């Protein structure tokens, strides 16, 4: 085998590889011998089929397999002999092959860059520190109390307001006909809840208990009863009673409704999700700050092919968002401006990914099988009843498994860097933390 470097441009390399006819023939004969031992043909005992017969019947497929093996083996040998760390699979282009002759092909590769991470201990980061504010817990408790409200008569002399419950007999049309499915007495209708035909409840706002109202409405064109679709209808309605929702008191009794020993325990339970969101936001802010500083401090060349792949993924998602009307400000930008912007983002992501990978490699940071198993279980739980299929999918799909492993590895490397860096704390309010203008942006 003869290997010659024909081109070197940045991280790109191209090699010409020539495999001798003798080497090809050895692979062909080896494959024919394997078939001779296993193939079964009429008129021959197992393992006794002459090689000439095997070649006559299977020669074409055997040669194709031999050439494929020769290219795979020689390309692997070429990379190993030169100690090349490639970013992506080589691009192979067969230049020339005639039966019985040498095999000549070119191999194009992109190399991983040599990366020298900066001094991690010199990184200075600021970590926002926030606690759950009492007002947020109070608001949540108020919502819980409202959800456990009870109805009580309106005792004061006043007209019906939105949110009140007007007790009426089933609405009767001016013709004396009751509505289908609404026959009955003492029907509680919450005003403003849009339980009935649009406009009906609004015309009862302002009525008092004992008052009679004539209500005019137009039924929607898609109303389920054919006779009423799009019909202009007049109803005669008697408001028999007004009731109001009275929220439960925020006390130990309310806590016990939720299985808590006391109001203090309920406050802790209500505050827990808020604290979880604060932790997530703090982690996001610190990680974004860290990645920004790493990006500023490192400017090595990145493999163009990796940038192309990353950009294509970003661009496909953007096209879907543009079609769905969820692209926000991007919807009004020219295509070339968007491509320039997102190619820059793709290059940044690739550079940061390579940098984090190198830091992890140098410090022997590994993703354990237990961590992968936990991630698999979490993913499977997203598909109740299909857990077995999820596990089988990841078992058969190495790329999907790598996509599951990659964020775990990244988080472990980020945690390692944070342990090395100088991290100061800055107290902020929970409201300020949550108002981060880039809160929905991805960390990378």
Swiss-Prot record:
GO cellular component: cytoplasm
Catalytic activity: [protein]-peptidylproline (omega=180) = [protein]-peptidylproline (omega=0)
Gene Ontology BP term (one): chaperone-mediated protein folding
Protein's cellular compartments: Cytoplasm
Listed transmembrane segments: none
EC number assigned by the record: 5.2.1.8
Principal cellular location given in the protein's record: cytoplasm
Pfam families associated with the record: FKBP_C (PF00254), Trigger_C (PF05698), Trigger_N (PF05697)
Enzyme class: isomerase
SUPFAM superfamilies: FKBP-like, Triger factor/SurA peptide-binding domain-like, Trigger factor ribosome-binding domain
Keyword Cell division carried by entry: yes
Entry's Gene Ontology molecular function annotations: peptidyl-prolyl cis-trans isomerase activity; protein folding chaperone; ribosome binding
Keyword Cell membrane listed: no
Keywords from the UniProt entry: Cell cycle, Cell division, Chaperone, Cytoplasm, Isomerase, Rotamase
Ranges of residues in domain PPIase FKBP-type: 163-248
Domain of life of the organism encoding this protein: Bacteria
The family this protein is said to belong to: Belongs to the FKBP-type PPIase family. Tig subfamily.
Domain observations: Consists of 3 domains; the N-terminus binds the ribosome, the middle domain has PPIase activity, while the C-terminus has intrinsic chaperone activity on its own.
Function description: Involved in protein export. Acts as a chaperone by maintaining the newly synthesized protein in an open conformation. Functions as a peptidyl-prolyl cis-trans isomerase.
Protein name as annotated: Trigger factor
UniProt organism field: Azospirillum brasilense
Lineage per the UniProt record: Bacteria, Pseudomonadati, Pseudomonadota, Alphaproteobacteria, Rhodospirillales
Name of the gene: tig
């Amino acid at each position: 085998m003869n290997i010659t470097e024909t081109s070197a441009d940045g991280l790109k390399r191209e090699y010409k590889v020539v495999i001798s006819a003798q080497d090809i023939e050895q692979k062909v004969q080896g494959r024919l011998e394997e078939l001779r031992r296993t193939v079964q043909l009429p008129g021959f005992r197992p393992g006794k089929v002459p090689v000439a017969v095997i070649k006559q019947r299977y020669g074409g497929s055997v040669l194709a397999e031999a050439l494929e093996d020769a290219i795979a083996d020689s390309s692997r040998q070429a990379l190993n002999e030169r100690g090349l760390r490639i970013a992506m699979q080589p691009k192979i282009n067969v230049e020339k092959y005639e039966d019985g002759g040498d095999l000549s092909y070119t191999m194009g590769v992109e190399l991983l860059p040599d990366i020298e991470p900066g001094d991690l201990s010199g990184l200075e980061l600021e970590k926002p520190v926030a606690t759950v504010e009492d007002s947020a817990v109070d608001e949540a408790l108020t919502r819980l109390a409202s959800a456990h409200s009870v109805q009580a008569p309106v005792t004061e002399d006043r007209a019906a307001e939105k949110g009140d419950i007007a007790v009426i007999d089933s609405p009767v049309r001016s013709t004396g006909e009751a509505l289908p499915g609404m026959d009955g007495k003492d029907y509680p209708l919450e005003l403003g809840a849009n339980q009935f035909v649009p406009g009906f409840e609004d015309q009862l706002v302002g009525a008092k208990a004992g008052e009679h109202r004539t209500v005019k409405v137009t039924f929607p064109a898609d109303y389920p009863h054919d006779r009423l679709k799009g019909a202009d209808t007049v109803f005669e309605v008697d408001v028999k009673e007004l009731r109001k929702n009275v929220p439960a008191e925020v006390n130990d009794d309310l806590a016990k409704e939720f299985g808590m020993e006391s109001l203090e325990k309920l406050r802790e339970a209500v505050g827990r999700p808020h604290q979880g969101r604060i932790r997530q936001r703090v982690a996001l802010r610190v990680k974004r700050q860290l990645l920004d500083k790493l990006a500023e401090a490192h400017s090595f060349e990145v493999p163009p092919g990796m940038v192309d792949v990353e950009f294509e993924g970003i661009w496909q998602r953007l096209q879907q968002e543009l079609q769905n009307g969820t692209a926000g400000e991007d919807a009004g930008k020219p295509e070339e401006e968007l491509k320039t912007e997102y190619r820059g983002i793709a290059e940044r992501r690739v550079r940061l990914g390579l940098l984090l990978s190198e830091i992890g490699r140098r410090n022997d940071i590994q993703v354990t099988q237990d961590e992968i198993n936990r991630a698999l279980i979490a993913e499977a739980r997203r598909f109740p009843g299909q857990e077995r299929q999820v596990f089988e999918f990841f078992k058969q799909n190495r790329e999907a498994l790598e996509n599951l492993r990659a964020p775990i590895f990244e988080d472990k490397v980020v945690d390692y860097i944070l342990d090395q860096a100088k991290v100061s704390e800055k107290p902020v309010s929970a409201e300020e933390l949550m108002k981060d203008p880039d809160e929905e942006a991805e960390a990378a």
